[in-house]
Design a protein with these regions (language model features):
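Extracellular, luminal, or virion-exposed ectodomains of exported proteins
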Residues: 13, 19-21, 30-35, 56, ...
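Serine-dependent carboxylesterase/thioesterase catalytic core
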Residues: 55-183, 203-247
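Loop/turn elements at helix/coil->beta-strand transitions in domains of secreted/extracellular proteins
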Residues: 1, 7, 34-40, 70-75, ...
């Protein structure tokens, strides 16, 4: 069994990946071993690199596992978050190009098959901070890091709505549409392979109770006086006011997006090694606190990152009705899927989802 790491910046940390799978709520790796599976964890030199580039690494891994295995057992191949898209594309490309991936089952864990979400207000604030303080001695690198992650090759391919700069309009990036065309060119899915998937969000239509059009983060100091970031709503909306003291305020406007922050889905992952474990709005608050020397007002740390309909490939995330409806198995492009009983952190290994995977892998 091969499972690929997901999106982040920098090199994969195999110890952290292992720890999250084995030493949390459910000892997933031990349970796989008890069921007779060998597990290969696939990492990447740069997790924010292009999905297509990292798929080349996945293909090398699949070929090596086939060459090194004992016997002729078929493989299970998949991944967490972006890792599911990397391996999905890798398997489809291998088949399209005449290769033999010898894979019986594909598995994705909270993978954004239909796209991921990062609030436009948060994206704009990250770019605003980089533009104004990115060269600050001692802090510029840290203050610019969130913006650089948002503008990485993988983020442009994953996010359903993306902005490259404060002044840009929210839309699918060209890198995403190009990737989707390439995925379609190689067949979209590997034929003849059973598709399994799990979502860290609910499948009942029950959201996370985060309301639309409310302020999630507000600054309290003197450097960013008047800056606020709001949750997303439908229709035309000012989702953020960005203000550097002494300069004109910059309103950030969106139009035609769904109220997606509160939708059923896996929540934006928290950073466990940073104070307060910041997530999406939480990271914006952390950056504001660094600039102002006092904490920002944070109402919501994490909102939806991978909607459930995306994780189980059941609908597009710009379909507001689908976002908040019970998921019909007939709508999914997966053969079998499991949604969490409550909305939880993106790619968190739970007993509910882990046990379902282990059971399904033992069922033809």
């Amino acid at each position: 069994m091969i499972l690929a790491d997901g999106f982040s910046s920098g090199k994969s940390d195999p110890d952290a990946l292992w720890n999250g799978l084995e030493n949390g709520e459910y000892p997933f790796i031990s349970k796989l071993r008890e069921a007779g599976f060998d597990l290969v964890l696939l990492g990447f030199e740069e997790r924010s690199a292009s999905i297509i580039d990292n798929a080349d690494v996945a293909i090398e891994c699949i070929e090596k596992v086939i060459a090194d295995r004992e016997g002729s057992a078929k493989l299970t191949v998949g991944g967490f978050s972006m890792g599911g898209l990397v391996t999905r594309y890798a398997l489809a490309k291998m088949h399209h190009d005449g290769g033999d991936h010898q894979t019986a089952t594909f598995l994705s864990y909270d993978t954004p098959h239909s796209g991921a979400w990062l609030p436009i207000s948060v994206q704009a604030f990250a770019h605003f901070v980089k533009d104004n303080w990115g060269t600050l001695p001692g802090f510029g690198e840290l203050l610019s890091s969130f913006s650089r992650m948002i503008n990485s090759a993988a983020a442009k391919q994953l996010l359903r709505w993306h902005i490259e700069s404060v002044s840009a309009q929210a839309q699918q990036h060209r890198a995403r549409t190009d990737f989707l065309k390439e995925l379609k060119r190689v067949g979209s899915w590997p034929p003849g392979v059973r598709r399994l998937g799990v979502a860290n969000g609910t499948g009942t239509g029950a959201g996370n109770n985060i309301p639309a059009r409310v302020t999630a983060m507000r600054t309290t100091g003197t450097e960013l006086t008047g800056t606020r970031l709001d949750t997303q709503d439908t229709g035309e909306q000012i989702v953020a006011i960005l203000k550097k003291t002494g300069s004109p305020e910059i309103p950030i406007t969106t139009n035609g997006l769904p109220d997606i922050d509160g939708a059923p889905g896996g929540l934006f992952p928290e950073a466990p090694n940073l104070p307060g474990r910041p997530a999406n709005f939480g990271t914006a608050a952390m950056l504001a606190g660094l600039l102002e020397g006092e904490p920002a007002e944070l109402t919501y740390n994490a909102t939806t990152f991978v909607p459930s309909v995306s994780a189980v490939a059941a609908a597009e995330v710009d379909d507001r009705d689908a976002l908040y409806s019970k998921i019909d198995p007939a709508d999914s492009e997966l053969d079998h899927f499991m949604c969490a009983s409550e909305n939880q952190g993106h790619t968190v290994m739970t007993e509910e989802l882990g046990r379902w995977i282990v059971d399904k892998l033992q069922t033809p």
